[in-house]
Amino acid sequence: MAALLDEREVEVGEMNTWNELIALVDGWAESRGIYNASNPQAQLLKAVSEMGELCDAEVKGLADDAKDGVGDVLVCLIIYCGMKNWSIRQCLDMAYTEIKDRKGRMLQGGVFVKEN
């Protein structure tokens, strides 16, 4: 997937738009050879590892680490989507379209379960 923005075009730490962030992650992965040397399965395994770190941060009440964990999982998923020539935005839109009218119930412990 070709980078839409050069990493140097955006100041570090400034709030970027969704599209800028996707392009920056894409360019970062491209410049480090991830698209050429890795594969979708490896990116999913990395995402699972990052999800474990996110869960660990949540359990320990480490808010900054949890935010970083969410970002790390998203980076892996953006790269995964890039390898599949998918738009992560389209994937999210597809998922929302599927759940938006979903009915279900809340289980004890706060998990929403869809109706059959």
Across the structure, where does each feature detected by a protein language model lie?
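Flexible "arm" and connector segments at domain edges
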Residues: 2-70, 74-116
